[in-house]
C-alpha cells in the first residue's frame, strides 16, 4: 500500500489544465510550441472539490498545494472560492500555490493574500528579468508578474521566488536573489532542472524550442557552472558504467517512494486520484509512447479504466485503498521493468539517483520568514 486513507497528510491538487505560458520542458506543450493534442482541457469546480474532499479529511490534512502538472492554478475560475472553503474548514491548514504569476489583476492578488492568510504561501516561478524570463516562461508578461507579486506581498502574502537555472540566465542568480529580497519575497530558491533527459533516458546538452507551427526558434542549454547543474543527470553516465545500461540500473535499484514517505496523494484536473504528479505527467503529451506511459496506462486499464479513479464518482478512501495504488506499490517488488516494475517510479524515486532532491541549489530564507 502506498498510503492508508487514515494516514493522509498532504494533497497536491491540479485545479485546471489551462495555462497561458509555453514552458519548453513542460509536458503540456510540444517543446514550448503548440499544446499537445491529447490533453483534456478541464478544471475542477468548487462544488466538485467539496464533493471529493470530506470535511473530516480536510480537518486533519497538514498541507494542500496547488501545483499543476499541465496547468497553472490561477487560471482556474474557482481557485479563490476553493481556497476560501479549505480555510473555513481547517484554519490551521497550510495552503500553497505554484504559478508563473502572469494572469489576474493586482486586486485579485491582494484578495489571494487575504484568503491564504498566515498559513499560506505562493511560489512565483520567475527565471530572470525582463530580458530573460520569457526565454523559458514563454508568452508570459514579466512586468505584469512583478506587479502581481508586489500586490500579493503588499497585502501580506507570503511570497517565494523560485528561479530555474539555464545557461541564458545563470549569470543572474545572485542579482535576482537580491531583487527578490528588495521586493519583499520571504524566500528565494535557485533550482536545477532535471529535464535535459529524453523519454528514453538519454542525456541531452540542449533542447530545441519550437514555435506553435513546429519550427525551431532557439535552444535551451544547460548552465556552464556545474553548481547549477542537476548532479543526478551527471550521475546517469556513472550508473551506466556500473550497471552496463541504464535499464539494468532501473531493474536493480530499490524504490523509495516520496509520496509514501510524505503520506501524499495527487488529484488531477479531470478528477482522478493517482499516486503522484510524476505518474500524471506520463498520461498525456509527448511521453505517451514511452515505456513509462504505457506501463501506467496498462495498469489503469487493468483496474477498469479512468472511471474507477474518478473522485467525483468514488471516494478518496476507495481509490487510495483500491487496486491501482496496490498494483503500483506491488510493482516495486518485481525484479525487472519487463516483469512489471514501474519504470517511472524507478527513475524518479530510485534511491541512487534522486532527481528531485538534487534540484535545489541555494535556498535563502530571510529574517522575516520564520515559518519554513
Residue locations for each model-derived region?
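Processing junctions and N-termini across compartments
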Residues: 13, 17-20, 251, 339, ...
Amino acid at each position: 500500500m502506498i498510503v492508508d486513507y487514515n494516514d493522509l497528510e498532504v494533497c497536491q491538487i491540479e485545479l485546471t489544465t489551462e495555462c497561458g505560458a509555453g514552458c519548453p520542458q513542460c509536458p503540456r506543450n510540444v517543446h514550448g510550441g503548440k499544446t499537445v493534442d491529447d490533453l483534456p482541457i478541464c478544471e475542477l469546480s468548487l462544488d466538485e472539490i467539496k464533493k471529493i474532499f470530506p470535511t473530516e479529511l480536510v480537518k486533519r490534512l497538514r498541507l494542500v498545494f496547488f501545483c499543476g502538472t499541465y496547468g497553472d492554478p490561477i487560471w482556474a475560475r474557482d481557485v479563490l472560492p476553493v481556497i476560501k472553503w479549505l480555510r473555513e474548514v481547517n484554519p490551521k491548514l497550510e495552503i500553497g500555490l505554484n504559478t508563473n504569476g502572469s494572469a489576474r489583476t493586482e486586486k485579485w492578488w491582494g484578495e489571494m493574500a487575504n484568503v491564504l492568510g498566515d498559513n499560506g504561501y505562493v511560489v512565483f516561478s520567475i527565471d530572470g528579468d525582463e530580458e530573460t524570463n520569457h526565454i523559458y516562461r514563454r508568452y508570459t508578461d514579466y512586468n505584469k508578474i512583478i506587479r502581481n507579486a508586489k500586490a500579493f506581498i503588499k497585502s501580506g502574502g507570503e511570497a517565494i521566488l523560485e528561479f530555474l537555472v539555464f545557461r541564458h540566465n545563470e549569470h543572474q542568480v545572485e542579482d535576482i536573489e537580491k531583487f527578490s529580497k528588495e521586493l519583499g519575497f520571504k524566500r528565494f530558491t535557485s533550482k536545477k532542472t532535471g529535464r535535459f533527459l529524453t523519454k528514453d533516458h538519454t542525456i541531452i546538452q540542449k533542447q530545441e524550442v519550437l514555435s506553435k507551427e513546429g519550427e525551431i526558434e532557439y535552444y535551451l542549454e544547460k548552465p556552464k557552472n556545474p553548481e547549477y547543474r542537476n548532479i543526478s543527470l551527471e550521475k546517469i553516465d556513472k550508473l551506466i558504467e556500473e550497471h552496463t545500461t541504464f535499464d539494468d540500473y532501473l531493474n536493480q535499484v530499490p524504490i523509495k517512494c516520496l509520496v509514501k514517505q510524505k503520506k501524499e496523494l495527487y488529484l488531477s484536473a479531470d478528477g482522478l486520484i493517482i499516486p503522484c504528479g510524476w505518474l500524471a505527467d506520463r498520461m498525456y503529451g509527448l511521453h505517451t509512447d514511452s515505456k513509462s506511459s504505457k506501463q501506467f496506462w496498462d495498469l489503469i486499464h487493468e483496474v477498469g479504466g479512468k472511471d474507477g479513479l474518478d473522485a467525483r464518482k468514488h471516494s478518496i478512501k476507495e481509490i487510495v485503498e483500491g487496486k491501482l495504488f496496490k498494483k503500483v506499490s506491488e510493482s516495486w517488488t518485481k525484479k525487472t521493468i519487463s516483469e512489471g516494475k514501474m519504470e517511472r517510479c524507478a527513475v524518479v524515486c530510485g534511491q541512487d539517483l534522486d532527481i528531485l532532491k538534487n534540484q535545489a541549489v541555494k535556498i535563502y530564507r530571510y529574517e522575516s520568514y520564520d515559518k519554513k
